[in-house]
């Protein structure tokens, strides 16, 4: 049967088109995501695809065989920052590999990155996958190793959480925690955006990128899109009482269409305020809040740099266990196109 490649604008494509793409993603998830996870519902994927940020471009492509999508590619590009970088993906249905479909569907993805002036390109590949060899042949480097870890929420040691709170209240007497729920109150908006820049101190290993800045306008767009994606987003922020300065925070996102799941996002403390137990205090307080307000949550997933020993230590103490090791491969776009002949 003949095939064709078409772009897909997920913000406007017919629902029937997105259902066909979703069916391929279900196959992809079963192959690449943790074994036994419930499938992502189409309704969740639909709202995620529909609601893109104003500061991002995500061109996608589908290789069709009749009414079925058998391969896909896409590329994420920030429109405000890190304008040299592009982050892409290619997936071919297992039953259709070995026919150059991957190369075919990758070509328009690379074209988009090139047209947008990107010089560096990255892929994320699960450790041990055969695609790692292809990345090597393309001249890419393993730039960043990430650990995806999971906490079985019902098995969390609540006495340990209480202990972390107690210890922090004794050690960090000059600080208090402030609970916030998206959208962030106007009075905290600029200080909170400034606080997020502390994430620029997190390990990047050999991944090449610039520091990122989030403006209040960007943050408000994130909040609007999170709500459209049916996500509750919660924060605890550590505040220095004497100065009122915000010095640390932790963030959790809860997809309402997947009520068993919580995503642990950023947790960071200003370097000038570390070694007082603020990180553990923030995470323990959030866990206690989730137990009270979100009783359906059974699993909390998070991503960390493999080299981020302090945060991994906290997570291990809480009971997080690695479920995936993912390597980000990065290279020169022109070089990898030449070596892959695509």
Task: Enumerate the predicted regions with their spans.
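Short amphipathic alpha-helix that is part of the acyltransferase structural core
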Residues: 1-51, 170-217, 341-342
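Acyl-donor-binding surface of acyltransferase catalytic domains
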Residues: 4-9, 103-187, 326-331
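Conserved beta-strand in the GNAT
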Residues: 58-62, 68-77, 87, 235-237, ...
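A conserved beta-turn-beta hairpin within the catalytic core of GNAT-like acetyltransferases
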Residues: 72, 77-90, 97, 255-265, ...
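Conserved GNAT acetyl-CoA-binding A-motif
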Residues: 85, 113-126, 290-303
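Conserved acetyl-CoA-binding loop-helix of GNAT-fold acetyltransferases
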Residues: 92, 98-111, 137, 269, ...
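Conserved beta-strand-loop-alpha-helix junction that forms the acyl-donor binding cleft
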Residues: 97, 122-132, 270-274, 300-312, ...
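Active-site/acyl-donor-binding loops of N-acyltransferases
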Residues: 138-157, 234, 288-342
